Amino acid sequence: MPSMTDSTAIALLSGGLDSATAAALAQEAGCRVIGLSFDYGQRHRRELQAAAAIAEALNLAEHHTISVNLASWGGSSLTDSAQALPVDGVQDGVIPSTYVPGRNTVFISIGLSLAEARGADRLVLGVNAVDYSGYPDCRPDYLDAFQTLADLSSKVGREGRGPRLWAPLVEWSKQKIVEEALRLGVPIERSWSCYSGGDHPCGVCDSCRIRDAALQAAGRPDLCSSASR
């Protein structure tokens, strides 16, 4: 774990387990963490409520929510309620319908803008190995390419002091993420990973299944969705 004492980090905070764990890791490393969430036209607001709850629980220095309506042109089952959400499991080599065109590129760009404005040293991302199997914008080669773009496209980058993209979970299994979240005291019960809204996770979408399997493996079935207990 790199030492980041006295550093400022911008943490993209979706409301899910992964981004919450990444933010907590940045805090443990000594960072002053600013949370950044996005209302991008997703099917429900439950994850934004979770992001606010996590920011409060982790006592983040600041938390901002930015509106970027990616639902205007659709292209994803996460922004278009007419499309069915996937429930058949993650398939190798297949980009699922929950991929939102350009989402991470938009989010990271805005995060870098905030980082440069605030003099932040890091941009913390919760992408991980599970996402690698599906989403093109959660892979190590994408992150490497974006770091190059960030260095070339900003004043601080050209001056050799641009913020570093930090994705500590990128090669972790979901079980390891859960175990680290438990160790760090991340409020898992306040996080939201389900593709659907409502008062309780559906337990059948791909995201719920991956999360529940990891919680079971980590010995915390009590935190699983009620459908899988």
Swiss-Prot record:
The keyword Transport does not apply. This is 7-cyano-7-deazaguanine synthase. Its cofactor is Zn(2+). It catalyses: 7-carboxy-7-deazaguanine + NH4(+) + ATP = 7-cyano-7-deazaguanine + ADP + phosphate + H2O + H(+). SUPFAM superfamilies: Adenine nucleotide alpha hydrolases-like (SSF52402). Catalyzes the ATP-dependent conversion of 7-carboxy-7-deazaguanine (CDG) to 7-cyano-7-deazaguanine (preQ(0)). One of its GO terms (biological process) is queuosine biosynthetic process. It is an enzyme of class 6 (ligase). Keywords: ATP-binding, Ligase, Metal-binding, Nucleotide-binding, Queuosine biosynthesis, Zinc. It comes from the Bacteria. Gene3D superfamilies: HUPs (3.40.50.620). Binds 1 zinc ion per subunit. It comes from Synechococcus sp. (strain WH7803). Pathway: Purine metabolism; 7-cyano-7-deazaguanine biosynthesis. Its EC number is 6.3.4.20. Zn(2+) binds at C194, C202, C205, C208. Belongs to the QueC family. Signal peptide: none annotated. ATP binds at L13, S14, G15, G16, L17, D18, S19, A20, T21, A22, A23. CDD domains: QueC-like (cd01995). GO terms for molecular function: ATP binding; ligase activity, forming carbon-nitrogen bonds; zinc ion binding.
